[in-house]
Amino acid sequence: ASMGADLTDAEINQSAMIADPLTLFDCCPISDGAAAVVVTRKGSGSSNGASHPVRVLASAQASGRARLSAHSDRCSFKATKTAACQAFEMSGLNPSDIDLVELHDCFSIAEIIDAEDLGFMQKGHGGGWASEGRTKVSGDLPINPSGGLEAKGHPVGATGLGPVSYTHLRAHETAS
């Protein structure tokens, strides 16, 4: 969608090689965009008609090495695992409690790596989950039902809040 045209599997697979095995269409394009979230403490201000407020149970962050060559495992990101562990511990939830996931998929492989690192499936099983349709909207665990960055592009300043905004809207739809 962000490329402005429907693409066939052949067009995607035959597009320019960027970094083997990733082709042009395995990489999300930088785009323009914005996202905004208003955060308040409980009882402050008006809910502006929000009949189903959403509560943040946990927030965590971690940093890792920027150079992939410095990673001991190029199919895993320690920072993702660390932040996920902290957030799940703070929230009292486990990966099995989650029923929709929006994650950073700047490259086609990133969705699989991140989903595994977040604990949604065993290491090495993410590709199988995706090819079996288990991560589709109608699957066991919908991952990036918004289309992710490959569908909407990578609006750098809005990339972090975009999934938050999308999941907030989905939570309101479910509650209604």
Language model regions located:
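Catalytic-loop motifs flanking and including active-site residues across diverse enzymes
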Residues: 34, 76, 80, 107, ...
